[in-house]
Amino acid sequence: MTTAQDLLDQLAVIDAGSELAQARETRDAATRHAQGSYETIFSADDGVDFTLAERLLLAENVARWHGDSQLASHYAERLNALPDEGNTARLESALDHGERLSFKPASATAAHLQALQQAGWSLDAIVTLSQLIAFVSFQTRQLRSYRLIGGHSVENASDRKIAAGYWRHDGKTHSGRSAPKVFTQAELGWEPWIPSKKLEEFDAEQQAILARFGHTDSDYFRLLGRNLPVLEQRTLTDKGIFYTSGGLPRKEREIAATVASKINGCIYCASVHSRKASQLSKQTEDVQRLIDTAPGGILSEGQSPRWQVQIDFAAALSATPPTASSAHIARLREEGLSTLEIVDLAQSTAFFAWANRLMLTLGEPFDD
């Protein structure tokens, strides 16, 4: 893939030969598969009953909700080149879902997915719809961070610290299992609100893809496997962001994932990534302090200066719409972070705008 084919490179106006361009080249897998995810979601040749016009209209709205008018204009231009399909109750239900996933993903319930089904959305289309909304949430944060690193102006910039978000604490899942009420580093389970695809429903080639990524026995990944090409690109993007050498230490990438999960209210994701951060950093008490932050509390309080600036940036990037500013980048550089490390921090945070919105709105955690 050349930079001429890379949407984020174009919209963020990344100078060829700059440190940012070099960092993205170093993280080639993340760069290629973020673009691959975009191309796969917006090709609309995946056999799912979800038209390209519907996809582009949803993407335009999601990009605007997340404060990126340039990305919204990109999707609008693509949409305007297609015949008008009109507005339908089915589309209105999808827009409602998109707005919920954008602003209050932790408020989603099983009833919301039932409403989508009643409006005519198939199970495969619901998964693809959720992937699209979550992916555009990821795109907007990638673009914002690249623009900031490149010295460009951004919308809605603020130096105000972003507080921890709301989370569900009902104590019971939709199926009646015990659900966690607080953030924890303990291992949790997760159950879907709509049926995962059974393993025998995948053909041999598809089963091999699931097996290659270790997804065979996971209800979550077999649910996302209802659109396997998108899942494959998403998984490769994940690996390109988190499983690379050099740059930001892995423990701090896990901290970024935890911060995003605290902002979005995703107890399950935070349990996985806070536990990993503790294992790698040996700073279990500091990580616990982070996840113990109550709604409205400031996540960086009581942390080391290096972690404070990273947490503040990750929180600001995770807000909807994001508020991360040039001042955040300046403080990261004052703490000695290189451009590659800042890219790693930004991409780790941005990816959990995607991951949280799937985990929170397609199912829920249990602890029994």
List PLM regions with ranges.
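Hydrophobic alpha-helical segments
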Residues: 1-368
